[in-house]
């Protein structure tokens, strides 16, 4: 099988592991910087070039598209899709996952529970908007933030209003959510491949913080996701159209709540903590999916 990996940096851990896993299973693997890809779109067909040469014959493509190049990267991925290349995470699914508001709407439509979320545009509605959420603490999130950036905890109603008004002044899109205190700064990252959770880890926020992201100083340990948590994680990925996803849950009194569905989850943390060859699981999924589509 001929596999392309859309990545701007071949030295990143996740990219290197996917290369290793693909080649170990006998496949040809090539890294394509999405920003060096360019395309021709016409009624008579789609074509893609890379550094002066046409790109053809790929059976599968693994998108590792950073948030800063989402628009162009997904356009390149979409071109490959139209050219008949299989991808576990289609371009439209990535776009759904990176718009927090849209993602939460889609999850809620499938009956998947999450922290109560509110969204509004007009400053005149701020007080009523926050009253729909209930008393603070509140969590304010940039709609397209990643890795814990643009996430603010407000402990007073006046602080919530101030942050909301400041973000509106910057023309930033954001959502506001209820704060789940019983989670105590911990979440569960479930790594979904296909129709199952292949690994799970519990992440704990650093002292004085409520964000559990590892690169912000959080710690992680291997975890055993319950059957309910695994079901919620798989349903969440499926609701957005993703076959490979990092689904972040928190454990609450009313059950698992989905915080986010990440379409480009890093492998380093989960492989290091859990000792699971997630990269190989992704490649096996590609093999099975391409075989079925050829079938």
Curated annotation (Swiss-Prot):
GO terms for cellular component: cytoplasm
Residues involved in Mg(2+) 2 binding: 260, 262
Positions with a binding annotation for Mn(2+) 2: 260, 262
Example of a GO MF term: metal ion binding
EC number: 6.3.2.-
Record text on cofactor binding: Binds 2 magnesium or manganese ions per subunit.
HAMAP family: RimK
InterPro entries, sorted: ATP-grasp (IPR011761), ATP-grasp_RimK-type (IPR013651), ATP_grasp_subdomain_1 (IPR013815), RimK (IPR023533), Rimk_N (IPR041107), Rp_bS6_RimK/Lys_biosynth_LsyX (IPR004666)
Protein family membership: Belongs to the RimK family.
SUPFAM superfamilies linked to this entry: Glutathione synthetase ATP-binding domain-like (SSF56059)
Keyword vocabulary terms for this entry: ATP-binding, Ligase, Magnesium, Manganese, Metal-binding, Nucleotide-binding, Protein biosynthesis
Classification of source organism: Bacteria, Pseudomonadati, Pseudomonadota, Gammaproteobacteria, Lysobacterales
Superkingdom, taxonomy of origin: Bacteria
Binding positions for ATP per the UniProt entry: 141, 178-179, 187, 211-213
Protein name: Probable alpha-L-glutamate ligase
Cofactors that this protein relies on: Mg(2+); Mn(2+)
Gene3D superfamilies per record: 3.40.50.20, ATP-grasp fold, A domain, ATP-grasp fold, B domain
Domain ATP-grasp: 104-287
Designated gene of the protein: rimK
The UniProt record lists the keyword Metal-binding: yes
Positions of Mn(2+) 1 binding: 248, 260
Any one Gene Ontology BP term: translation
Residue positions binding Mg(2+) 1: 248, 260
Enzyme kind, highest EC tier: ligase
């Amino acid at each position: 099988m001929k596999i392309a990996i859309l990545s701007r940096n071949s030295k990143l851990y996740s990219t290197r592991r996917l290369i290793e896993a693909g080649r170990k299973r006998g496949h040809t693997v090539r890294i394509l910087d999405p920003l060096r890809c360019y395309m021709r779109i016409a009624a008579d067909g789609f074509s893609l070039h890379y550094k002066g040469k046409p790109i053809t014959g790929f059976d599968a493509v693994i998108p590792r598209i950073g948030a800063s190049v989402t628009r162009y990267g997904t356009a390149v991925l979409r071109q490959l899709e139209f050219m008949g290349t299989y991808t576990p995470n289609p371009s439209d699914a990535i776009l759904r996952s990176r718009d927090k508001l849209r993602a939460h709407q889609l999850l809620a439509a499938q009956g998947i529970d999450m922290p109560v979320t509110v969204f509004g545009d007009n400053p005149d509605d701020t007080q009523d908007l926050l009253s729909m959420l209930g008393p603070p603490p509140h969590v304010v999130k940039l709609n397209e933030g990643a890795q814990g950036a643009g996430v603010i905890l407000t402990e007073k109603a006046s602080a919530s209003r101030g942050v909301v008004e400041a973000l509106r002044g910057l023309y930033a899109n954001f959502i506001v959510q209820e704060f789940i205190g019983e989670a105590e700064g911990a979440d569960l990252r479930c790594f979904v491949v296909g129709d199952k959770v292949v690994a799970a880890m519990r992440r704990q926020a650093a002292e004085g913080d409520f964000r559990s992201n590892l690169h912000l100083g959080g710690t992680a340990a291997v975890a055993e996701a319950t059957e309910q948590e695994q079901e919620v994680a798989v349903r969440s990925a499926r609701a957005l159209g993703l076959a490979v996803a990092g689904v972040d849950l928190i454990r609450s009194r009313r059950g698992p709540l989905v915080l986010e569905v990440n379409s480009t989850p890093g492998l380093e943390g989960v492989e290091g903590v859990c000792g699971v060859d997630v990269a190989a699981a992704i490649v096996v999924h590609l093999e099975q999916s391409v075989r079925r589509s050829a079938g």
